[in-house]
UniProtKB/Swiss-Prot annotation:
Keywords: Transferase. Its EC number is 2.5.1.-. The keyword Lipoprotein does not apply. Belongs to the UPP synthase family. Gene3D superfamilies: Decaprenyl diphosphate synthase-like. This is Dehydrodolichyl diphosphate synthase 3. One of its GO terms (molecular function) is rubber cis-polyprenylcistransferase activity. PROSITE patterns: UPP_SYNTHASE. GO terms for biological process: protein glycosylation; response to cold. Its cofactor is Mg(2+). It comes from Arabidopsis thaliana (Mouse-ear cress). Pathway: Protein modification; protein glycosylation. One of its GO terms (cellular component) is endoplasmic reticulum.
Length: 302
C-alpha cells in the first residue's frame, strides 16, 4: 500500500513540475503527450549518465578504480603542446613548459594510484627535423626540468631513467641526465622513464646488432636467442616492467609514432582528443577506467 501511495505521489509531483516548466502556469491545461514526454526525460537521466560513462565522457572518480586491476606500467605520448599554445595565443615554448608541468602532475598521480612505472615520449628521433630554435628550446627545457626536480624525485623516492640515443644531445643535458640517474638509482617503488631521441625501430636494430656482436665473441649461441634475450637488449631493460600495460596518446592522433614498437605488442591503447597540457586528473581516471573494463587476452581465447 505504501509503495502504491509513493508512486502516486511521485506521479503527482512530476505532473505539477511538468506544468510549471512547460507552461510556467499551473492552471493552463496540458496535453497528455507533453506530460508523458517530460516524465520520460526525467526518468531517463540515469540512463543518460550510464551512456556517458560508457562513451568515456562521464567524469569518473578514484573510487571507481580497482587496485588489483591497476596497470603496472603506463606509457604516454604527450601530443598537443604546440596546438595548445597556439589556441591560447602563447609561444610554442610556453606550450612545452605547460606540457612539462603536466607530466609531473600526471606521473605523481599515477604513482599515488599504485602504478609502478610511467614512461613518457619526450623527444623522438624524428623531432630533430623540427625548427632549430624549437629543438634548442626543447633541449633546454628538458635540462631545466630534470635539474630542478632532482631533489623532488629524491624526496618522492622516484627513480628516473632516460633512454634513447644520447650521443646527439647537448653535453650539459647529458651531464644532467647522468646526475639525476645516479641520484635516484636506488629507488625501487616508483620509476619514471623519459625517452629522448628515441626510435622504436632503432631500439630493435641496436638490440639485434648487440646480439650479433656477442654471438661473434662466442658469448651467446643461436639457440640462446629468444624473446627474453631481445627484451634484455632493448633500452627498456632498465625497468622491471618493460612492456606497458596501457599507452595513452593525447590530442586526437591515433598512431604510436615509432614509440616502443616491440614493447607495445599487447598494450592496451587509449586515444584522447584532449591536448596534453589539458590532460588532467579526470582524463587520466577516464583512461584507467577504460583500461580496467577491458578483457586482456594476449592473443588467446578465454
Amino acid at each position: 500500500m505504501l509503495s502504491i501511495l509513493s508512486s502516486l505521489l511521485s506521479l503527482l509531483f512530476l505532473f505539477i513540475i511538468s506544468c510549471f516548466f512547460i507552461t510556467s502556469h499551473f492552471w493552463f491545461p496540458l496535453s497528455l503527450p507533453k506530460i508523458l514526454g517530460f516524465i520520460k526525460i526525467t526518468s531517463s537521466r540515469d540512463d543518460y549518465d550510464n551512456e556517458q560513462r560508457d562513451e568515456g565522457t562521464y567524469v569518473v572518480g578514484v573510487e571507481e578504480l580497482q587496485r588489483e586491476l591497476m596497470p603496472r606500467h603506463v606509457a604516454v605520448i604527450m601530443d598537443g603542446n604546440r596546438r595548445w599554445a597556439k589556441r591560447a595565443g602563447l609561444l610554442t615554448s610556453q606550450g612545452h613548459e605547460a606540457g612539462a608541468k603536466r607530466l609531473i602532475e600526471f606521473s605523481e598521480l599515477c604513482f599515488k594510484l599504485g602504478i609502478h612505472t610511467v614512461s613518457a615520449f619526450a623527444f623522438s628521433t624524428e623531432n630533430w627535423g623540427r625548427h632549430k630554435i624549437e629543438v634548442k628550446c626543447l633541449m633546454s627545457l628538458i635540462q631545466h626540468y630534470l635539474k630542478s626536480k632532482i631533489q623532488y624525485f629524491q624526496r618522492e623516492e622516484t627513480r628516473v631513467s632516460v633512454i634513447g640515443n644520447l650521443t646527439k644531445i647537448p653535453e650539459s643535458l647529458l651531464r644532467t641526465v647522468q646526475e639525476i640517474e645516479e641520484a635516484t638509482r636506488s629507488y625501487k617503488k616508483k620509476h619514471l622513464i623519459l625517452a629522448i631521441d628515441y626510435s622504436g625501430r632503432l631500439d630493435i636494430l641496436r638490440a639485434c646488432k648487440s646480439i650479433v656482436k656477442k654471438s661473434e665473441k662466442g658469448l651467446i649461441r643461436e639457440e640462446d636467442v629468444d624473446e627474453a634475450l631481445i627484451e634484455r637488449e632493448l633500452l627498456t631493460n632498465c625497468t622491471e616492467f618493460p612492456s606497458p600495460d596501457l599507452l595513452i596518446r593525447t590530442s586526437g592522433e591515433q598512431r604510436i609514432s615509432n614509440f616502443f614498437l616491440w614493447q607495445l605488442a599487447y598494450t592496451e591503447l587509449f586515444f584522447s582528443p584532449v591536448l596534453w597540457p589539458d590532460f588532467d586528473k579526470d582524463k587520466l581516471l577516464e583512461a584507467l577506467v577504460s583500461y580496467q573494463r577491458r578483457e586482456r587476452r594476449f592473443g588467446c581465447r578465454v
